[in-house]
């Protein structure tokens, strides 16, 4: 991850578009849904649902195109258009929700009509208030917050303009540096982008709460928890149950990693305390794969350094293109030297070519199991590398532009393993889009939002060391126990390390929406949860002037995050089911479904359902069980768990919570 979590996927429903894409999308005035008749009947309800599907389907391409432009060309003009269009879209949504109330309680509704009426009510992460002025303010704030994140930069003291650093540049430091000062500076630099968002986010949350209350919910958090075919209270209990299943594995991993970091950094990492968040190889400490070299169990058991191979491929391509360019330039301009701009254009060309080649590696896996090739327009219209001439929202996302074959990915691919896995993840969204496009518009979303995030990650579980060797990304790998533990450690640093982070983001938001965390305590509440669940602390002292949640895209982008926690559980269930369908015999961690059409057929059958039925029905058809369950992830990592317990014998695992969550890793505890 391998920061795939990353993925603000654009779900294919007008309601979910407003939720999942950070997209308060613009558009021209929409055809208003027909008002419900005074004495509504089941037939009227069916006609109403059909019209909602038709109206939303007609409006969707324009909204999505406008949102694409707003995220790829961040200017005051595109933000204004985005906000105004978002206001119109929220108005249509508000009308549909209000009109749907006329059909509540009808006894003879067809099941598919009843389900779609429910989806109209709960599918949006941004419930619009009925007051037009509040809707306008909500749309404007959403657009502003999203744009501030995309344009965010850190200017070191005394620096400005071109010397300021964007997220990509700061991530290069966090991901690869081992200099504690450089790491702390980069971490604090990026987290400073959240500070200007704090007041706006408070207003934004308040306006969303107004909309949620009008729908009959206590707050937005309760509305979000209602979207899982169970009561909000039952869903909260379900996430806690799943966390309890996997928590022991996380705590063993934390204990082991903390010990290794203590060996590296000394007392900066307390032997039995919280880990500073900047030392884990990821800007948000959500996945720890970039510190694999510091914690690798057996250094003599072969290399799994995919990033070095990818970087070498990129460098070879760059060298080839530069030689060709210089030869061509010398012939055309004798005695002259190319400008910096000329060389920058060559570099951008190389980045684009490399990015396309990387995307084709991912596409090849999907087509090998029987899914169709992507249309040529995918490579023509996707943004796969950071432009040199403008700010963009580089956070990886997948887009279904028109529900008629125009699918795209927006992502700034880099030559490293993180980007390789992220493109596999995003392509999972793309194929989900294409598979459920035959469903009515309201069903064109995941069975639940965790399903959408799990599709591509299920595929990455087949990127075993043996598979990576076959495609030339690692040297010959051994199949002995040392090599197995190394491979499991590498994967656990992403898959297991992420689990508490995936849960706590929405724990914080739910508490904010309910008022349990007040505006005055935003940062305190944030770090209290990060310390409680992850066992990490801010590397530098924080205050309530800061707004560290704003440094994570999904908060200003308003993308619910529990989906990622769920996806990291169910992707192992999916993987196990597909391995069974493929006839694989062996340990789950060794399964690779590449090229297996039987597994692909079973996968496609699930993808085609979209949200047309309660998710337990969809899950049961693939896995044979109606319950999300952590047993597959525990089975997968059983060898590593045994190793970790052995290594942690005699250590004081776990951590105490500090008296002051904002004070950093060395603050007193009680």
Q: PLM ranges: what are they?
A:
Residues 27-45, 77-78, 118-120, 219-222, ...:
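C-terminal, non-catalytic "cap/extension" segments appended to globular domains
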Residues 33-203, 221, 552-555, 559-562, ...:
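N-terminal helix-rich structural modules
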Residues 22-25:
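Bacterial signal peptide processing site
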Residues 17-20:
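C-terminal motif of bacterial Sec signal peptides marking the signal peptidase cleavage site
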Residues 222, 226, 412, 433-458, ...:
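Post-HEXXH active-site segment of zinc metalloproteases
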Residues 162-169, 203-410, 480-491, 497, ...:
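Active-site-proximal, well-structured secondary-structure segments within enzyme catalytic domains
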Residues 235, 239-249, 446-484:
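Post-HExxH zinc-binding segment in Zn-dependent metallohydrolases
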Residues 415-426:
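Short alpha-helical catalytic segment bearing the HExxH-like zincin motif
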């Amino acid at each position: 991850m391998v920061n795939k979590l990353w993925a603000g996927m654009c779900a294919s429903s007008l309601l979910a578009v407003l939720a999942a894409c950070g997209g308060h999308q613009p558009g021209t005035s929409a055809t208003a849904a027909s008002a419900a008749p005074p004495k509504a009947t089941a037939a009227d309800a069916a006609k109403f649902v059909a019209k909602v599907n038709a109206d939303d389907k007609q409006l969707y391409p324009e909204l999505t195109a406008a949102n694409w432009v707003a995220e790829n060309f961040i200017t005051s003009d595109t933000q204004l258009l985005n906000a105004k269009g978002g206001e119109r879209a929220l108005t249509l949504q508000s009308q549909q929700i209000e009109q749907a109330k006329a059909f509540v309680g009808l006894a003879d509704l067809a099941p598919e009509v009843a389900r779609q009426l429910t989806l109209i009510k709960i599918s949006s992460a941004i419930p619009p208030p009925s007051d037009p002025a509040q809707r306008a303010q909500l749309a404007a704030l959403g657009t502003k917050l999203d744009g501030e994140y995309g344009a965010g930069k850190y200017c070191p003291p005394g620096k400005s303009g071109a010397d300021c650093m964007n997220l990509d540049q700061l991530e290069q430091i966090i991901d690869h540096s081992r200099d504690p000062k450089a790491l702390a500076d980069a971490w604090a630099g990026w987290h400073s982008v959240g500070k200007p968002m704090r007041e706006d986010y408070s207003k934004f949350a308040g306006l969303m709460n107004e909309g949620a209350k009008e729908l009959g919910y206590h707050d937005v958090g309760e509305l979000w928890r209602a979207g899982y075919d169970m009561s909000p209270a039952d869903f909260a209990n379900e996430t806690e149950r799943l966390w309890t299943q996997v928590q022991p594995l996380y705590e063993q991993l934390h204990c082991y990693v903390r010990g290794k970091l203590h060996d590296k950094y000394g007392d900066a990492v307390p032997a039995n305390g919280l880990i500073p968040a900047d030392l884990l190889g990821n800007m948000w400490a959500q996945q720890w794969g970039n510190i694999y070299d510091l914690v690798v169990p057996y250094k003599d058991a072969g290399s799994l350094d995919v990033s070095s191979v990818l970087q070498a491929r990129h460098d070879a391509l760059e060298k080839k293109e530069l030689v060709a360019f210089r030869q061509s330039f010398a012939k055309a301009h004798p005695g002259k030297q190319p400008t910096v701009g000329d060389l920058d254009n060559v570099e951008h060309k190389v980045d684009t070519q490399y990015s396309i080649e990387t995307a084709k590696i991912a596409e090849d896996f999907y087509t090998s199991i029987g899914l169709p090739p992507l249309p040529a327009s995918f490579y023509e219209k996707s943004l796969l590398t950071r432009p040199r001439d403008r700010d963009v929202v580089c956070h990886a996302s997948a887009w279904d532009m028109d529900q008629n074959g125009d699918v795209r990915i927006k992502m700034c691919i880099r030559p490293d393993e993180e980007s390789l896995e992220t493109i596999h993840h995003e392509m999972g969204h793309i194929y989900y889009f294409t598979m459920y496009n035959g469903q009515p518009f309201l069903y064109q979303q995941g069975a639940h939002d965790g399903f959408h995030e799990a599709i591509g990650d299920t595929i990455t579980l087949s990127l075993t060391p043996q598979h990576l060797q076959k495609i030339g990304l690692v040297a010959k790998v051994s199949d002995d126990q040392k090599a197995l533990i190394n491979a499991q450690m590498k994967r656990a640093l992403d898959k297991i390390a992420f689990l508490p982070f995936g849960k706590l983001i929405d724990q914080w938001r739910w508490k904010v929406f309910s008022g349990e965390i007040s505006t005055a305590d935003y940062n305190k509440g944030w770090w209290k949860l990060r310390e409680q669940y992850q066992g990490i602390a801010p590397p530098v002292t924080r205050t309530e002037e800061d707004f560290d949640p704003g440094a994570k895209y999904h908060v200003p982008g308003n993308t619910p995050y529990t989906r990622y926690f769920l996806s990291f559980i169910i992707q192992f269930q999916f993987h196990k089911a597909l391995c069974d369908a493929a006839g694989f015999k062996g340990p789950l961690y060794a399964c690779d479904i590449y090229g297996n059409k039987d597994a692909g057929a079973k996968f496609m059958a699930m993808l085609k359902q979209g949200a047309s039925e309660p998710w337990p029905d969809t899950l049961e058809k693939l896995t044979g069980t109606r319950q999300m369950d952590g047993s597959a992830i525990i089975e997968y990592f059983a060898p590593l768990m045994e190793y970790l317990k052995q290594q942690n014998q005699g250590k004081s695992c776990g951590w105490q919570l500090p008296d002051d969550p904002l004070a950093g890793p060395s603050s007193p505890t009680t």
